[in-house]
């Protein structure tokens, strides 16, 4: 592989210095920007970072052998990281959009057989090949929007056979697509129709059958639960998360999205890597998360699409908890792949600064999927995952919403998007 020399960026936003822990409080505003910055890449890794003058001198005898990427007038950031998605699914749910506009709530639609249950039916019925192709198209769109690593949850199978099918497709995508796919088992996404009269029985199936099988096959790193009234209680969620820990699956939790339900407190209790949503989390729950180092993954696109009040990122940041942002890409409550849009919503709806929003989709998002040591910032030794945005500064990326500013994407030192087009 030829060396890659990315030269003369208007802004090189490195976010250097937080590979061992996420950024918190005022540190989220410290982006460590290099004007007229350049990056030298060797064998898929970042080998040097500095001004163009510094690197041109350092590598003057090797520039002729390198592939040159001219970043003049552009902003270079770490590859974006999406730490919470449900992008491996079949079907679509645009009919529910009209239902919600007529006044139906998320839980009303779900209890009527729509929502997660509708996507479960479509995903169960889809062949593995169909599921792969539909999901690959979404993954291509993530890449075109600057995402180089994405978390993918199961949870639209809700049986051993179909959960394994979803996770197998996610693994195949990780192996065949430039974007790294980090898998989360979420058999506890909903209680399927066949278990609606015996939810505790379904919990036993998750604990005694699904988790052991997923662990045996090596299909996931994390274990997630939708802890909400009418879905899984805190007691049921605790059982599922502790069972996952026993099999080496790190806990995550969908917490306090619809009402304060003790999800944030439970996340702190079980040592979750992250607690996600948190629209209605209690102050005490947030305090405990901050104390235990649980990352708050906030999903403003979901609140926007469901027309509800978003989580209070300002309060969570000021409380000392690390904050990441994510699309929550899914067919029912956030059908988007655009992290730049999510950054804009994080500022407008959640009280974040633009710098905090960018940190939340790079280094903090990387820590939310246990990858902060290898991605999320532009530092020597890390993966050469980089994005060139066709804007002169990072503020424009967030301010000028509604269009895709991605020009070039580098994944593991290889150009995979050029002039806004896939080239892998």
UniProtKB/Swiss-Prot annotation:
Essential cofactor(s): Zn(2+); Fe(3+)
Cofactor note: Binds 1 zinc or iron ion per subunit.
GO CC terms, sorted: cytoplasm
Main location as per UniProt: cytoplasm
Record-listed 4-imidazolone-5-propanoate binding positions: 93, 156, 189, 257, 333
Coiled coil: none
Residue positions binding N-formimidoyl-L-glutamate: 156, 330, 332
Subcellular location: Cytoplasm
Binding site residues for Fe(3+): 84, 86, 254, 328
Pathway named in the protein's UniProt entry: Amino-acid degradation; L-histidine degradation into L-glutamate; N-formimidoyl-L-glutamate from L-histidine: step 3/3
Any one GO molecular-function label of the UniProt entry: zinc ion binding
Root EC class: hydrolase
Catalytic activity: 4-imidazolone-5-propanoate + H2O = N-formimidoyl-L-glutamate
Listed EC numbers: 3.5.2.7
Pfam families reported for this sequence: Amidohydro_1 (PF01979)
Annotated positions binding Zn(2+): 84, 86, 254, 328
Function: Catalyzes the hydrolytic cleavage of the carbon-nitrogen bond in imidazolone-5-propanoate to yield N-formimidoyl-L-glutamate. It is the third step in the universal histidine degradation pathway.
Family: Belongs to the metallo-dependent hydrolases superfamily. HutI family.
Name assigned to this protein: Imidazolonepropionase
Source organism (scientific name): Geobacillus sp. (strain WCH70)
Gene field: hutI
């Amino acid at each position: 592989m030829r060396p890659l020399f990315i030269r003369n960026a208007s802004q090189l936003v490195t976010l250097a210095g937080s590979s061992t822990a996420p950024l918190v409080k005022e540190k989220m505003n410290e982006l460590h920007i290099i004007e007229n910055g350049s990056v030298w890449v060797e064998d898929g890794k970042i080998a040097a970072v500095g001004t163009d003058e510094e690197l041109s001198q350092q590598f003057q005898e090797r520039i002729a052998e390198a592939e040159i990427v001219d970043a003049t007038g552009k902003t270079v950031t770490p590859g974006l990281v999406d730490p919470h998605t449900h992008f491996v699914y079949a079907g679509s749910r645009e009919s529910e959009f009209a239902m919600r506009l007529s006044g139906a709530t998320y839980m009303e639609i779900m209890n009527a057989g729509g929502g997660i249950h509708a996507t479960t039916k479509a995903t169960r019925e889809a062949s593995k090949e169909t599921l792969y192709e539909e999901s690959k198209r979404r993954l291509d769109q993530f890449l075109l929007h600057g995402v180089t690593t994405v978390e993918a949850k199961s949870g639209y199978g809700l049986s051993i056979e179909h959960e394994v099918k979803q996770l197998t497709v996610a693994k195949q995508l990780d192996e065949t697509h430039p974007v790294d796919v980090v898998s989360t088992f979420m058999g506890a996404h909903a209680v399927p129709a066949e278990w609606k009269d015996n939810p505790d029985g379904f919990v036993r199936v998750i604990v005694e059958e699904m988790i052991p099988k997923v662990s045996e096959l090596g299909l996931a790193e994390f274990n997630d639960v939708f802890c909400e009234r009418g879905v899984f209680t805190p007691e049921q969620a605790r059982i599922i998360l502790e069972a996952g820990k026993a099999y080496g699956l790190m806990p995550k939790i969908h917490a306090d999205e619809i009402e304060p339900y003790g999800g944030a407190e439970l996340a702190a209790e079980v040592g979750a890597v992250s607690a996600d949503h948190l629209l209605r989390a209690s102050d005490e729950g947030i305090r405990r998360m901050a104390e235990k180092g649980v990352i708050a993954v906030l999903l403003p696109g979901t609140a926007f699409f469901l027309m509800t009040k978003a989580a209070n990122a300002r309060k969570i940041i000021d409380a000392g908890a690390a904050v990441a942002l994510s699309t929550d890409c899914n067919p029912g409550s956030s059908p988007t792949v655009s992290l730049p849009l999510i950054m804009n919503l994080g500022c407008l709806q959640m009280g974040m600064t633009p710098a905090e929003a960018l940190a939340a989709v790079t280094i903090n998002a990387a820590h939310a999927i246990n990858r902060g040591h290898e991605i999320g910032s532009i530092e020597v030794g890390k993966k050469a995952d980089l994005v060139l945005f066709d804007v002169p500064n990072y503020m424009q990326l967030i301010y000028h919403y509604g269009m895709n500013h991605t020009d070039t994407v580098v994944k593991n030192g290889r150009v995979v998007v050029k002039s806004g087009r896939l080239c892998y």
